[in-house]
Amino acid sequence: MAKIDDNIKQKIKTLNREELEKLLIKAATKHKEFHDYLLVNYIDKEFGEKELFERAKSDLNVLFYKSYKGFSEQLRLANMLSACIKRINEFAKVCKNKNLEADLIMCVLEVPFSYSTNMFGTCFTAFDYKVGLRVKRMITLVTKKMHEDYLIDYKEKINKYLDILHRTSGHIDFIYAFPKKID
C-alpha cells in the first residue's frame, strides 16, 4: 500500500466537492476492491456484505468447474484450491465478517472431501498440503477469530475433515501436528 505524503493530503483537503466526487468515481471504476469497500461501508451497509458473499460464492462455483494444469487429478485440485483461496482472500480484505469467510472456506473444503479418501495420501502431497492449509485456516477462524458459539456450527464437519486427514495424510508433518479434533 502506498504511503501518502503530507503534500498530497493537503491538496486533497483543498479540493472542492465536485472534484472529490470525480476522484472517488474514477478510483471506484479502476479498482474493484475499492468499489466493494465503498459498497460495504457506505452505499449498502445492510446488504452489501451479503451481496459480496453471493458474488464470491458464484465466482467459486465457476472456479470449481474450470480446468487446471496438472499431471494428476490431485495436482489439478491443488491448483483449483489455490485459485479459490485467492478469491476468498479478496473477499476477506473488503468484508470483515468472519462468519461469511468461514462459510466460503467450508464451501471450498467440500470439494476435495467429496472425492474418495484415496485422493489423499498419494505421492502428490501438494494436494494434501493445500487441503491441510484450508482446514488449518478454518480451525483458526473458528477457534480464535469468531465467537465461540459459531464453533457448534462447524465443529462436526471440521472434526470429520481432521479424521480423514489424519487417517490418510498423517505422514506429512504439517498434518500430523493438527489436533485430532476440536472441542
Task: Tell where the protein language model's regions lie, with residue ranges.
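Sequence-level detector for tyrosine residue identity
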Residues: 34-37, 42, 65-68, 115, ...
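Short coil/turn residues that cap or connect secondary-structure elements
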Residues: 16-19, 120, 146, 150
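N-terminal interaction modules that seed assembly of large macromolecular complexes
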Residues: 2-69
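Eukaryote-biased recognition of C-terminal alpha-helical segments
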Residues: 127-183
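Charged linear interaction tracts used for macromolecular binding and regulation
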Residues: 60-144
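Surface-exposed polar/charged interaction patches
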Residues: 15, 30, 66, 91-94, ...
